[in-house]
Amino acid sequence: MELVLDDRQRAMLREMGVHVWMPQVDAHEAVVAERSAQLKGGGPRLGGTEQSALPARPIVNSAPAVVPLKTEGSSSTQLALHGRDWQALAAAAASCQACGLCAGRKNSTLQAPESPVQCDWLVLGDPPDEDEDRLGQPFADQAGLLLDNMLKAAGAHRGGMARAGAYVSNVVKCRPPNARLPQAAEMEQCAQYLQREIALVQPKLILAMGRFATQLLLQEHPQQAALPLGKQRGTVYRYQGIPVVVTYHPKVLLRASADKAKAWADLCLAMDIVEASLQ
């Protein structure tokens, strides 16, 4: 897609601390045409060495399809979530006791959206923190404000519809007790909720924000999942056939402003994928 920033988007990027550099028009249009052809053709092969003239637009590398998380030797409880609407799904999450995470829960962060419609964006974040647990919603407080600004710069927002819509969720719906890390079996258990969320949202793209969200979506690729998040960036993965782009969690960006430009590049890649899905 051709990235044309209006004054509002530039202001939002300044809010993120990103300095926007745009190439000369002729060069930019040439690269956009080349990238459009690549996306229509499925993108270059994994491990290709071709480089784009636009630094903020990483080349799309297609990885093998990622299937739902499965842990060897797991004995996860199969939840009866198939066919549930948003209200029933949220009620199930609020009363769920399928794993030990419920011991630390004040509120589930899986909430029925006000307008239950299809959204092109699904944003998956790390386990809920204290603010998310207290409010019962993903991406709360300053991290949530930063995410909202990032989405607005991409032309999307929470509660929007279709191309302008973004549904946000956590990799697990309950805050781990005593702020501990979630276990693999707990993430597998909660992945059943994510699979139903995906079925209801029907996203064109999943934006994985943070290392736990990324671990869930890349579990079938242990070599890639074991890499630092910074080395997982710039590649398009797939989860249940849906493109996945990896980037930093907003809480990390608030602490490390130098990574905001990298997050903007990831967002540009995500915008390209959403745009290509509409062609």
Name the predicted role of every residue range.
Residues 2-7, 11-279:
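A polyanion-binding, active-site-adjacent surface
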